[in-house]
Design a protein with these regions (language model features):
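Short, Lys/Arg-enriched N-terminal segment that forms or immediately precedes the first helix
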Residues: 18-33
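The alpha-helix within a helix-turn-helix
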Residues: 47, 58
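Intrinsically disordered, low-complexity basic tails/linkers immediately adjacent to helix-turn-helix/homeobox/MYB/SANT
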Residues: 81-109
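Short alpha-helical "packing" element that flanks the helix-turn-helix/winged-helix DNA-binding module
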Residues: 43-44
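Short helix-coil-helix linker/hinge
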Residues: 34-40
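Helix-turn-helix DNA-binding motif, specifically the short coil turn and the N-cap/start of the second
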Residues: 53, 62-67
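DNA major-groove recognition helix of helix-turn-helix
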Residues: 72, 79
Length: 109
């Protein structure tokens, strides 16, 4: 059986997150989990933490601006769901490669 569609492109991530698990306080027992992929984490870091434009952030991740926008929207939705429902957030997985080469993130390719 063959796969239909275009193969997925690797997303470029600059670094592993320092913390890969967040849990709400005041919630007894083990809360449900929301999984945030590494590319979603990187998109949120670039757009919301560093304040880059979508064009510049997309260039940094080596994806199109439309793909970046989709990744960012999905990541924000996961975080909003986790916060609204008291879920823990685990950062793992995704289709990514860690690129440690220095690059000026304000210049889009």
């Amino acid at each position: 059986m063959s796969l239909i569609g275009r193969p997925k492109k690797y997303r470029m991530i600059r670094q592993d997150p320092k913390v890969s698990f967040f849990s709400p306080r005041g919630r007894p027992g083990r809360p449900d989990q929301a999984i945030l992929t590494m590319d979603e984490f990187e998109a949120i870091r670039l757009a919301d933490d560093l304040g880059l434009s979508q064009k510049a952030a997309a260039g940094s991740m080596h994806v199109s601006q439309q793909t970046f926008s989709r990744i960012l929207k999905k990541g924000r939705k996961i975080i909003a769901d986790a916060m609204s429902h008291g879920k823990s957030i685990k950062i793992r997985g995704g289709f990514y490669v860690i690129n440690t080469q220095p690059e000026n993130p304000t210049q889009a390719k």
